[in-house]
Amino acid sequence: MTRRIRIAAISLALLCAAGAYWWSLQRLTFLPADTAVFVAQVAPPPAKDSPQMRAEIDELLAIQAARTEAQREAARADRKKDIRQFYGPLGVEAAAEESLDPLRTFMDRVEGDVGIYVRAAKHRFARPRPYVVEPRLKPCIGDVADNQSYPSGHSAYGYSVALVLADMVPERRTELLARADEFAHHRMTCGVHYASDIAAGRKAAEWLVVEFGKEAGYRAAESEAAGVLRAAIKLPPVPAK
């Protein structure tokens, strides 16, 4: 009887997990509720005992050894995913922030879709965090899943934001991508991601932004948000493509 109860409990847990995952797919705003194609094109991370894995751990140890308090605080400040962290490269003035609520709503929906797709890949690979593999690494932030290192969700978010905003404001593309580089690298500064996690997150963002562009609902919402943004930073409407 005990064995039957255990099997029933496990089955129920699996059903609940599957149900929760399916429910999350229903929350997608722009992308189709099918992450399989995305996950299939994500290359696997370096093997656990490979020279590349060792090199990436050594790189993180070197970053940790050289890390200053200012770098630590900057990395901690980038822990939250917030479109306002990219206002600097856009030249958004404080007085204009309130007018950008429609942009924030749009980007929150983009982030939601990106997050659902990237989490599907994280579950597929279940890569342990660097500090799990190398105890000498002391992360400067907590509250991250120990086995969801690859791809980096922060990297995917940062590059998705930069690429979407660069489509709206191509005049600031270089500055936006530089901010995304910094945003993503801060995850290595804190010791919670390998370099290959960051690279995979960027590739995921590039793939997803292309897919966003195929969806009519996304294109309409992006056009509206772009108008709001360009008006707020005193730029003329983006030329028609």
Where are these regions (language model features)?
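Short alpha-helical linear motifs
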Residues: 128-131, 158-160, 198-206, 226-229
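Hydrophobic alpha-helical bundle signature of multipass membrane enzymes
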Residues: 21-189, 221
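Interfacial helix-loop-helix junctions of multi-pass membrane proteins
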Residues: 182-213
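N-terminal Sec-pathway targeting helices
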Residues: 1-13
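Hydrophobic h-region of N-terminal signal peptides that target proteins for export
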Residues: 14-20
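Acidic, carboxylate-rich catalytic segments that either coordinate divalent cations
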Residues: 213-241
